[in-house]
Amino acid sequence: MGKLGIYLLADYPSRELFIEAVKVCQDFNVDFLEVGFPFSDPIADGDVLERASYETLKRYNLDDFIAGLKEAREIFKGRVYVMTYANIVYSSGVNNFLERVGNISGIIIADLPLREVRLFEKEFRQRSVSLIRFLTPESRVEDIESAIKGADESGFIYFVSKRGTTGGDFSLDEETIEKINRARGKGVDVYVGFGVKDRKDVESVYRVADGAIIGTKAVSELERGIDAFRDFIRDITGSG
């Protein structure tokens, strides 16, 4: 059985609903959470997450997102990762940002090229926070080897299932599966995201990777209300 990760946008649709969603994920034994910190130019996000980011930034700021993250961390017992953009980390100062977010397992920087990971590595290692590497269907063999080398026991490799932004349809072609297998063959956990939206997609991921990440669909269901979100998580986890 693979691991399941759910992406939630910090304080969206509101702080109250965000925290209620965290409680649902805890109740249904979701393995890990990605908590997104909204950014004004979210280049990796599709229409749903882009709109959600803009709406959230009208009402909340980084201080709010960090406060929401810490409240979530008190509730959720699994691993918690922050997903954000390089400008937020740079502008805060890497050490200051890591100190402020506190006790988390790792950070995913959506627009950080693999070749620039080294710029952050020292500070992350000093604080025992994983800097999650991305791989894509276009990743070269040397990229895969670099990602494997940099991964640590509290982290994973985030394999983007398709070209483009979050959301959309899910598929894994043979070339992508081959690259996932190459990374897994070195003993590193590989989690697949982008376009994963239902139980069928999750089961497809579990056949070739160590875990699945659901983002856009989870946020869309939460927009409908906490009951719709709970039903969605119940279905995805196979809990009835």
Predicted regions and their residues:
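Short beta-strand/loop segments at the ligand-binding rim of alpha/beta enzyme cores
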Residues: 2-5, 75-85, 124-136, 183-195
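Conserved beta-strand positions in the central sheet of alpha/beta enzyme cores
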Residues: 5, 34, 108-109, 132-133, ...
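Active-site beta-loop-alpha junctions enriched in small/polar residues
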Residues: 9-11, 38-40, 83-87, 112, ...
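Catalytic cores of alpha/beta
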Residues: 15-26, 139-152, 192, 196-212
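Receiver (REC) domain switch/active-site residues of two-component response regulators
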Residues: 31, 105, 155, 210
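Active-site/ligand-binding-proximal alpha/beta "capping" segment
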Residues: 97, 159-211, 217
